[in-house]
C-alpha cells in the first residue's frame, strides 16, 4: 500500500504538495477503516465457529444418548418378545392339553358355533348402531350450522338496530343543539330587557326629581302670589301691570305643570307596560328552564341507554368469539371422532376377520370332535351303567366318611372345577354353583374313576393351591355377587365332564358345578351346610334337557336367603327378597359393628388362611349334618310331595317348571328395575331326566369389602327360626328408574322367594341385591340395564383380602338376554374359604367387572367365544389426572373376554396407586395379578363422594359405547387413546347420539378405586412361574409411568416418548 502511495505521489508531482498530502491522509483513513472491518469480521467468524463447534458437540452427545436409549429399548423389546414367546409357548402347551379334554364333548362346539354366529350378528348390530350414531352426528352438525346461521342473522338484526339507535341519537343531538341556541337567545333577550329596565328606572328617578323641584317652585309661587295679592290690594293701582305680568307667568307655570303631569302619566304607563313584559319574559324563562331540565334528563337517559347498548354489544361480540371458538372446537372434535370412528371400524373389521378365522378353526375342530364323540359316547354309556349300581352305595356310605376325605374330595372338586373351566373354553365354572344333578346315570358316571393320567394332567397346574383350597379362579355367574362360605362338594372328573355337556346346553352361562351324588360323600361338609347353616335350599325339578337352559338361569339369581325356613312356592309372582335385603342394608349401613350377632363378628375376623377353625366349626355341626342328610334323602324319596307342598326341611325348596311363563313376566319386570344386590345367590342345574332332586346351594355374597366379612354369614349362624329376611339395600335416594323393593319380614314369609326362582327358570337372573347406601348412582338410559359396581372398603379388613365387591346388578346387566343365557364370571378376588374350606362369596373376578360395562347391544357377552376380544376395555377418567386412561394390559388367556382387564370406574385416577403398590398375595401359594386398592373409608365419606356429574357420566358412557379397545399386545395408536381420553372431558359435545351405556357408578369417584390388571386365570396363574409374568407387567407399568412423567415435564421430547411408549406396548 505504501508503494502504491509513493507511486501515486510521484505520478502527481506536478500537483501541489498540499493536495497530495490530503489525498494520502484520506487513503490512509480508508485503509484503516477497511482493516478494522476485516478484523471485526474475523472476530465474528471465530465466535460463530466456536459456537457452531459447541452446538455440534452437543448434537453429537444427544445423538449418542439417543442411540444408547434406542439400543436399550431394543434390548428391552427383545427381552419382552422372548418372554412373550415363552409365555405363548406355555399357553400353547396348555391349550393343547385343553383341546384334548375338549374333544370329549360334541354338543358344546355346536352351541359354540351358534354363539359365534350370534356374536357376528351382534357385531353387525354394533356396526348399525355406529352408523346410526354417525348419522346422528351429521344431524347434530347440520343443526349446529343452522344455529350458527340463525345467530348470524340475529347479529345482523342487532347491528341494524344499533344503526337506527345511532340515527336517533344524532337527531336528538341536533334538536338539543337547537334548544341550546334558543336558550342562548333567551338569555340575550333577558339581558337586554334588564338593561332597558335600568334605563327606565334612571329616567323615572330623574323625572321624579324634576316633579319634586317643580312642586317646590309651585309652593314658592303660591306664597309669592299670596304676598303679591296682599301687596296688590295696597298697590292695585300701582301693581296692576305687575299683576298682569305675574298672571301670565302663572298661567305659563300651570301649563308647564299640566305638561309635566301628562308626561308623568305616560311614564307610569310605560313603566307598568315594561313590568308586564318583564313578567312575561320571566315566565317564558322559567318555561325554558323546565324544558332544558327535561332535555338534560332525556340526554342522560339516552347516554345511559347507549352505555348499556355498548356493553351489550361488547358482550355479544365476546359471545360471538366464544361461539366461534366453540364451533371450531366442535369441528375439531367431530373430525377427531370421525377419525376414531374410522379406526374403530378398522379394528372391527379386523375382529370380524379374526372371528371368521376362529370360526373356521372351530369348524375344523368340530369335524374332528364328531369322530371322537361316537367313541366317547359308548364309553359314557358303560360308565352310566356302572354308576347306576354304585349310586346308592355311596348314599349309604356317606355317614362313614370323615372330614378329611371330604376335604380331599373338595380339593379334587375345586381343581376339577378349575380344569373344567379351561376345558370348556371361556366357560368357567362358578365357585358357588353347588347344584346337584341326582340323575342315577350321572351319579354312576361320577363314581367311575377315570384314568389317573388324565386327571393328573388336569389337576397338575392347581396342586399348588389345592392345600389351601384356593379355588379363586372358579367362575361365578355374572349376576352372582358372592361365593358360598362352604366347601364345594366333591366332584369327580366324570361329573366335570357331565357339567361340560350341560354347560353346552346353555352357552351363555357358566353352568353350575354339578355335584350330583357326591352330596352323600360330603356329609360332613356338604349336608351340614344345608341344614345347620340354614343358607342352602334344595330345588326339586323335573325339567328335561330342553328346559335346562331356563333352569340354569338360576345361577344368577340374587336370592338373599338369610333364613332357611322358606318353602318355595313358584305360583307366586311377588318378589319376596326385599325385606331381607333391607335387613342386610341396615347392617351394612352400620358396618362399624359389622353385624348384629357374634357369629358375624367372628366371621368378619376370619382370614383366608383360617382353615383349621373352619374345619373345627364343621365338626361341631356334624350332628346337624346327619339330620340334613336324612332330610335330603327323604326329599329324594318323596319327590312328588315335595313338588306339591314344598320340602319339610326349611333349607329345601321345590321348583316347579310349569310356572315358567309367570316367572318370565317377573323376569321382565326385574329387568326394568334396579334391584338391590344379592347376598346369596341360587345356582341350580336341571337334570336331564325326571325324578332327579336338585340340591341347590345358595351362595353367600359379600356386599362389599366393608361388609363382606360382616354380612357373609347373615344366614349362616342364624337358627332355622330366623325366617326369611332378605337383605335388600335400601337406597337413601333412589332414582325414579330404580326400584328398591322394601317389604317387611312378615310379607316375605308369605311370598318366600318364589319369584326369584321363577325368574331363574325363565333364565333371567332376578337381581343382584345391591347395597345402595349412596354407593351407587345408577343412571338408566331408555330401556337399558345399568350396571352399578360397588366399591366400598372396610377399615377392619386386612389388605390381604383384596376383595372387590363391584358386583354388577343382574337384572339390569347386559348379560341377560331374552333367551336367558347367562355367563358365569371368574371371582378371583376374595378368598374367604377359611369359613368352611371354600371361597366365600365376596370375590369378584375381573371378568365379572369386565362385563359390567358392556352395553345390551353386545350379544349377551358369551363366555364361550374365543372371539370375545371385542369386550370394551375403556378408560373412563372421572378426574383429570396426569396418567392417561389408555394403559392396557395383555391377557395370557386365549379367551380374553372372560379374563381381560377391566379398568373399573376411576381406572385412570387409580393407576398411580397401582404403580406404587405391590400385588397382594392372598396366600403363600397363589399369585394374584388383580390388585385392588380400596381405601379405608367410612360409609359417610363414601356417601359424600357419591353424586357425580351425570353429564360427565353420560360422556364417559358415550365414550365407552363407541370405542372397543382390545387387549391385544399391539395396543392402539397414541392418537386414538388420547382422543378417547379427551372425549371424556368434552363438556360441549352432545351425547345424545351415543347409545347410552351403563354408566360407571359414581362410587368409582369415591375413595375406593379399583384397578385390576388381571391376566388369564389359566393354570399358569397358579404356577410359581407366574411371578415372572407379574414382575414383567409391573416393569412395564413402571416404564410407562416414567415415560408419562417425561411427557408431562418435557414437552419438546413428546415424540420420543410416544415412540418409546409404542415400542413398549407393542
UniProtKB/Swiss-Prot annotation:
Biased composition (Basic and acidic residues): 967-978
Organism: Mus musculus
InterPro entries linked to this entry: CCDC73
Keyword vocabulary terms for this entry: Coiled coil
Location of region: Disordered: 568-600, 719-811, 854-883, 944-978, 1003-1027
Coiled coil: 47-134, 178-391
Gene designation: Ccdc73
Official protein name in the record: Coiled-coil domain-containing protein 73
The keyword Coiled coil belongs to this UniProt entry's keyword annotation: yes
Biased composition annotated in UniProt, kind: Polar residues: 591-600, 742-781, 789-811, 857-869, 948-964, 1003-1013
Residue intervals passing through the bilayer: none
Amino acid at each position: 500500500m505504501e508503494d502504491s502511495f509513493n507511486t501515486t505521489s510521484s505520478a502527481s508531482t506536478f500537483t501541489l504538495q498540499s493536495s497530495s498530502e490530503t489525498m494520502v491522509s484520506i487513503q490512509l483513513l480508508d485503509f484503516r477503516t477497511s482493516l478494522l472491518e476485516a478484523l471485526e469480521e474475523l472476530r465474528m467468524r471465530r465466535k460463530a465457529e466456536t459456537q457452531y463447534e459447541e452446538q455440534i458437540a452437543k448434537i453429537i452427545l444427544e445423538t449418542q444418548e439417543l442411540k444408547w436409549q434406542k439400543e436399550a429399548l431394543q434390548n428391552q423389546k427383545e427381552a419382552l418378545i422372548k418372554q412373550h414367546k415363552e409365555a405363548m409357548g406355555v399357553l400353547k402347551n396348555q391349550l393343547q392339553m385343553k383341546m384334548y379334554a375338549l374333544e370329549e364333548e360334541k354338543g358344546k362346539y355346536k352351541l359354540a358355533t351358534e354363539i359365534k354366529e350370534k356374536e357376528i350378528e351382534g357385531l353387525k348390530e354394533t356396526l348399525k348402531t355406529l352408523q346410526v350414531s354417525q348419522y346422528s352426528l351429521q344431524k347434530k352438525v347440520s343443526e349446529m350450522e343452522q344455529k350458527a346461521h340463525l345467530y348470524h342473522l340475529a347479529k345482523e338484526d342487532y347491528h341494524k338496530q344499533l344503526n337506527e339507535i345511532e340515527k336517533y341519537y344524532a337527531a336528538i343531538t341536533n334538536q338539543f343543539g337547537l334548544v341550546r341556541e334558543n336558550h342562548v337567545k333567551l338569555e340575550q333577550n333577558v339581558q337586554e330587557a334588564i338593561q332597558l329596565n335600568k334605563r327606565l328606572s334612571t329616567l323615572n328617578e330623574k323625572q321624579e326629581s324634576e316633579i319634586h323641584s317643580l312642586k317646590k317652585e309651585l309652593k314658592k309661587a303660591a306664597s309669592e302670589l299670596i304676598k303679591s295679592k296682599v301687596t296688590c290690594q295696597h298697590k292695585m293701582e300701582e301693581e296692576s301691570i305687575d299683576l298682569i305680568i305675574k298672571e301670565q307667568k302663572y298661567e305659563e307655570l300651570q301649563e308647564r305643570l299640566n305638561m309635566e303631569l301628562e308626561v308623568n302619566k305616560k311614564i307610569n304607563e310605560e313603566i307598568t307596560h315594561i313590568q308586564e313584559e318583564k313578567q312575561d319574559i320571566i315566565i317564558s324563562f322559567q318555561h325554558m328552564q323546565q324544558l332544558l331540565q327535561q332535555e338534560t334528563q332525556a340526554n342522560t337517559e339516552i347516554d345511559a341507554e347507549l352505555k348499556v347498548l355498548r356493553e351489550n354489544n361488547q358482550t355479544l361480540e365476546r359471545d360471538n368469539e366464544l361461539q366461534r371458538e366453540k364451533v371450531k372446537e366442535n369441528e375439531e372434535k367431530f373430525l377427531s371422532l370421525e377419525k376414531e370412528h374410522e379406526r374403530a371400524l378398522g379394528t372391527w373389521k379386523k375382529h370380524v376377520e379374526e372371528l371368521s378365522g376362529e370360526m373356521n378353526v372351530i369348524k375344523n375342530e368340530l369335524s374332528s370332535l364328531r369322530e371322537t364323540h361316537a367313541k366317547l359316547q359308548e364309553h359314557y354309556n358303560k360308565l352310566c351303567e356302572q354308576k347306576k349300581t354304585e349310586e346308592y352305595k355311596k348314599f349309604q356310605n356317606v355317614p362313614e366318611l370323615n372330614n378329611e376325605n371330604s376335604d380331599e374330595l373338595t380339593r379334587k372338586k375345586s381343581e376339577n372345577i378349575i380344569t373344567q373351566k379351561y376345558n370348556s373354553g371361556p366357560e368357567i365354572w362358578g365357585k358357588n354353583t353347588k347344584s346337584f344333578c341326582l340323575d342315577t346315570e350321572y351319579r354312576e358316571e361320577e363314581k367311575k374313576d377315570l384314568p389317573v393320567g388324565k386327571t393328573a394332567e388336569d389337576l397338575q397346574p392347581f396342586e399348588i393351591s389345592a392345600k389351601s383350597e384356593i379355588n379363586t379362579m372358579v367362575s361365578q355367574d355374572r349376576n352372582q355377587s358372592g361365593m358360598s362360605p362352604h366347601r364345594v362338594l366333591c366332584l369327580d372328573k366324570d361329573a366335570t365332564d357331565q357339567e361340560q355337556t350341560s354347560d353346552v346346553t346353555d352357552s351363555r352361562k357358566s353352568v353350575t358345578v354339578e355335584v350330583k351324588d357326591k352330596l352323600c360323600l360330603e356329609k360332613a361338609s356338604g349336608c351340614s351346610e344345608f341344614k345347620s347353616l340354614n343358607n342352602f335350599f334344595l330345588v326339586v325339578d323335573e325339567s328335561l334337557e330342553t328346559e335346562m337352559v331356563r333352569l340354569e338361569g338360576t345361577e344368577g339369581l340374587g336370592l338373599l336367603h338369610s333364613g332357611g325356613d322358606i318353602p318355595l312356592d313358584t305360583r307366586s309372582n311377588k318378589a319376596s327378597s326385599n325385606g331381607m335385603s333391607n335387613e342386610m342394608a341396615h347392617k351394612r349401613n352400620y358396618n362399624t359393628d359389622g353385624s348384629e350377632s357374634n357369629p358375624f363378628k367372628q366371621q368378619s375376623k376370619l382370614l383366608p388362611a383360617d382353615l383349621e377353625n373352619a374345619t373345627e366349626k364343621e365338626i361341631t355341626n356334624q350332628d346337624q349334618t346327619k339330620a340334613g342328610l336324612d332330610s335330603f334323602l327323604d326329599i329324594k324319596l318323596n319327590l312328588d310331595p315335595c313338588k306339591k307342598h314344598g320340602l319339610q326341611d326349611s333349607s329345601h325348596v321345590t321348583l316347579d317348571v310349569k310356572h315358567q311363563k309367570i316367572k318370565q313376566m317377573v323376569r321382565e319386570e326385574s329387568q326394568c328395575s334396579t334391584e338391590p344386590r344379592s347376598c346369596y345367590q341360587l345356582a341350580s342345574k336341571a337334570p336331564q331326566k325326571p325324578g332327579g332332586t336338585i340340591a341347590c346351594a345358595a351362595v353367600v355374597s359379600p356386599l362389599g369389602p366393608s361388609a363382606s366379612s360382616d354380612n357373609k354369614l347373615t344366614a349362616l349362624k342364624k337358627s332355622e327360626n330366623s325366617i326369611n329376611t332378605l337383605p335388600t339395600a335400601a337406597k337413601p335416594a333412589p332414582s325414579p328408574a330404580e326400584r328398591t323393593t322394601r317389604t317387611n319380614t312378615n310379607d316375605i314369609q308369605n311370598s318366600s322367594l318364589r319369584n326369584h326362582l321363577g325368574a331363574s327358570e325363565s333364565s333371567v337372573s332376578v337381581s343382584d341385591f345391591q347395597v345402595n347406601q349412596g354407593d351407587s348412582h345408577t343412571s338408566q338410559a331408555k330401556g337399558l340395564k345399568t350396571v352399578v359396581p360397588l366399591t366400598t372398603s372396610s377399615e377392619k379388613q386386612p389388605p390381604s383380602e383384596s376383595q372387590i365387591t363391584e358386583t354388577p346388578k343382574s337384572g339390569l346387566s347386559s348379560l341377560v338376554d331374552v333367551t336367558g343365557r347367562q355367563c358365569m364370571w371368574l371371582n378371583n378376588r376374595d378368598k374367604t374359604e377359611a369359613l368352611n374350606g371354600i371361597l366365600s362369596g365376596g370375590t369378584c373376578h375381573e371378568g365379572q367387572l369386565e362385563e359390567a360395562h358392556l352395553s345390551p347391544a353386545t350379544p349377551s357377552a358369551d363366555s364361550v367365544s374365543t372371539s370375545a376380544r371385542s369386550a370394551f376395555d375403556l378408560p373412563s377418567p372421572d378426574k383429570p389426572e396426569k396418567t392417561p386412561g389408555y394403559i392396557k394390559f395383555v391377557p395370557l388367556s386365549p379367551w380374553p373376554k372372560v379374563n381381560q382387564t377391566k379398568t373399573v370406574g376411576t381406572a385412570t385416577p387409580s393407576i398411580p396407586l397401582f404403580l406404587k403398590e405391590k400385588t397382594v398375595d392372598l396366600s403363600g401359594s397363589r399369585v394374584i395379578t388383580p390388585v385392588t386398592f380400596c381405601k379405608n373409608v367410612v360409609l359417610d365419606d363414601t356417601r359424600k363422594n357419591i353424586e357425580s356429574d351425570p353429564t360427565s357420566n353420560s360422556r364417559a358412557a358415550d365414550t365407552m359405547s363407541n370405542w372397543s379397545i382390545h387387549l391385544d399386545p399391539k395396543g392402539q395408536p397414541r392418537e386414538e387413546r388420547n382422543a378417547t381420553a379427551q372425549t371424556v372431558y368434552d363438556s360441549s359435545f352432545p351425547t345424545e347420539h351415543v347409545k347410552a351405556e351403563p354408566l360407571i357408578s359414581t362410587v368409582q369417584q369415591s375413595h375406593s378405586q379399583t384397578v385390576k390388571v388381571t391376566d388369564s386365570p389359566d393354570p399358569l396363574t397358579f404356577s410359581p412361574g407366574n411371578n415372572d409374568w407379574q414382575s414383567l407387567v409391573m416393569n412395564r407399568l413402571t416404564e410407562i409411568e416414567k415415560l408419562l412423567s417425561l411427557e408431562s415435564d418435557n414437552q419438546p421430547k413428546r415424540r420420543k416418548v410416544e415412540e418409546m411408549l409404542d415400542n413398549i406396548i407393542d
